[in-house]
């Protein structure tokens, strides 16, 4: 098997207007390739054949995992042990002739902008994009165990292309202010949007060998969509989905003498799953209320091993 991954990252933080305006941007790109990652179970697992291979047999004999077949005019799997009812194959054949390859490209972009309107008032916004493209291929060469190739002796080919797109953005107003020596106010209010999309196209099927169907045999070990069976044994699938959630939210906490606190929060979501004509409601709201008291501020002399005690109750 093999695994390669390369990461490229960029980030820059800048301040303007006497440090009142701050901009933070970043970008990442990930390129990943892997082949024949470890597989559990018996299918496509070289460890099964390696474990049960008779100790008295010459291991070097199966290292030459394929032999030329004059009748078929191609190289076929050499595995004198047989499948033993366990779908076993030559471990080397699995590694080099049952190829499962994955190529993934992913890029992530993010930006955050923050502005201090006053010393107690801040406005900020964030945007994050995370997109990835993935290509997964299966190439099972001729003479692979037919249970893995939909019954064909000429092999199997499959390709799956997927795209994932995620976008998230929010805006937020933050307040942190004191009134005299006793009262304090911490509050924030904002809105956010989350959008996710997924698209996939998949084609997977056997290369006709003239036996499993009435089709004429096609070239073995030619891995292309045009070389696959036109029967129901070839699976062709296109699917995708999209979901989006729009939200508004706010929270307020009022403090007195840094001892007593009252907290109120509320959030309303509009998920796309509830946007259908048969939905009873298109959104849902969930509030909460809480109160707390710092007992350690009220107790004159706290024990040395106990410096902070807080009692809190909330309802949501």
Q: PLM features: what roles do these ranges have?
A:
Residues 269-271:
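Active-site beta-loop-alpha junctions of metal-dependent nucleic acid enzymes
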Residues 243-247, 254-259:
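Short, flexible loop/turn motifs enriched in small residues
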């Amino acid at each position: 098997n093999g695994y390669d991954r390369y990461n490229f990252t960029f980030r820059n933080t800048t301040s303007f207007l006497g440090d009142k305006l701050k901009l933070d941007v970043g970008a990442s790109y990930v390129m990943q390739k892997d082949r024949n990652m470890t597989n559990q179970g018996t299918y496509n697992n070289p460890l099964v054949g390696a474990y049960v291979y008779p100790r008295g047999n010459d291991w070097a004999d199966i290292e030459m995992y394929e032999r030329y077949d004059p009748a078929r005019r191609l190289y076929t799997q050499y595995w004198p042990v047989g499948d033993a009812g366990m779908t076993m194959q030559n471990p080397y054949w699995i590694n080099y002739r049952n190829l499962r390859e994955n190529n993934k490209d992913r890029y992530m972009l993010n930006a955050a902008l923050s502005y201090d309107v006053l010393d107690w008032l801040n406005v900020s916004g964030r945007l994050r994009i995370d997109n990835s493209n993935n290509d997964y291929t299966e190439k099972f060469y001729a003479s692979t165990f037919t249970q893995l190739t939909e019954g064909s002796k000429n092999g199997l080919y499959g390709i799956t292309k997927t795209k994932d797109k995620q976008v998230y953005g929010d805006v937020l107003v933050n307040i942190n202010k004191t009134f005299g020596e006793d009262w304090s106010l911490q509050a924030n209010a904002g809105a956010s949007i989350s959008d996710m999309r997924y698209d996939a196209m998949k084609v997977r099927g056997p290369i006709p060998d003239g036996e499993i169907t009435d089709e004429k045999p096609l070239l073995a070990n030619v891995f292309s969509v045009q070389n696959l069976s036109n029967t129901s044994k070839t699976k062709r699938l296109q699917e995708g989905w999209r979901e989006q959630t729009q939200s508004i939210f706010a929270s307020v906490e009022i403090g007195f003498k840094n001892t007593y606190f009252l907290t109120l929060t509320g959030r309303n979501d509009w998920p796309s799953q509830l946007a259908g004509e048969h939905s009873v409601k298109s959104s849902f709201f969930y509030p909460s209320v809480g109160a707390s008291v710092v007992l350690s501020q009220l107790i004159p002399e706290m024990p040395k091993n106990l410096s902070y005690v807080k009692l809190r109750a909330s309802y949501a």
